[in-house]
């Protein structure tokens, strides 16, 4: 998901 990419940071 898009949020997943951000949370990975």
Swiss-Prot record:
Keyword field contains Secreted: yes
Compartments in which it is found: Secreted
The entry's keywords: Amidation, Neuropeptide, Secreted
Biological process according to GO: neuropeptide signaling pathway
Keyword Secreted: yes
One Gene Ontology cellular component: extracellular region
Domain of life: Eukaryota
Leucine amide: residues carrying this PTM: 9
Role noted for this protein: FMRFamides and FMRFamide-like peptides are neuropeptides.
Family recorded in the similarity comment: Belongs to the FARP (FMRF amide related peptide) family.
Name by which UniProt lists this protein: Extended FMRFamide-8
Organism, as annotated: Namaquaphasma ookiepense (Gladiator bug)
Lineage of the organism: Eukaryota, Metazoa, Ecdysozoa, Arthropoda, Hexapoda
